[in-house]
Amino acid sequence: MGQKINPTGFRLSVLKNWSSRWYTNTKKFSDFLNEDISVRQYLQKKLAHASVGSIIIERPSKNAKITIHTSRPGVVIGKKGEDIEILRRNVEKLMNVPVHINIEEIRKPEIDAQLIAASITQQLEKRIMFRRAMKRAIQNAMRLGAQGIKIMSSGRLNGIEIARTEWYREGRVPLHTLRAEVDYGTSEARTTYGIIGVKVWVFKGEQLGIKERQN
């Protein structure tokens, strides 16, 4: 099962936490979910060049707190905080509640799965050979402390007629072990030959579960 399932969803409540952290009654659930999707799409579009790894949305009583994990916090904040204030006002219009935006820096973007996937897709769109992009990402991740990494690319690689899938792995990536901290990210490269999908798994070591850490 660990081979097929999303590694993040597989470890929810054991090692990982949800990216949307709120609870509501049945009537409002679909509205809140649509708001979350709209906010994420807006932020990902506006911060496309800010190397955003993840977006956490929390909803305390009648307001919202959004945490943006990025390797380039200066790009998100902008000169004298102007850009982040514009973001906050626009997100408030989408959510219809007061919003607080918090920025957290990703210290090692080379071992963040989502940023690795985004970096590879950017290189593919610039017509860089997919093997070179994948191998370079693997070397950087292993050099900066990853215990294992696996990268998979699918589509018309190098413009070939028949789509295929290629993957590279270095180190170990235990997909069945629940206590294994496996970071997972996906991205799509829009090339002249069509879309190329990229998936990245990064194994950062084994950890105690959420409940064990609390005890």
Curated annotation (Swiss-Prot):
GO terms for biological process: translation. Residues 39-107 form the KH type-2 domain. Signal peptide: none annotated. Keywords: Ribonucleoprotein, Ribosomal protein, RNA-binding, rRNA-binding. SUPFAM superfamilies: Prokaryotic type KH domain (KH-domain type II) (SSF54814), Ribosomal protein S3 C-terminal domain (SSF54821). Pfam families: KH_2, Ribosomal_S3_C. One of its GO terms (cellular component) is cytosolic small ribosomal subunit. One of its GO terms (molecular function) is structural constituent of ribosome. HAMAP family: Ribosomal_uS3_B (MF_01309_B). Binds the lower part of the 30S subunit head. Binds mRNA in the 70S ribosome, positioning it for translation. Belongs to the universal ribosomal protein uS3 family. Part of the 30S ribosomal subunit. Forms a tight complex with proteins S10 and S14. This is Small ribosomal subunit protein uS3. It comes from Nitrosomonas europaea (strain ATCC 19718 / CIP 103999 / KCTC 2705 / NBRC 14298). The gene is rpsC.
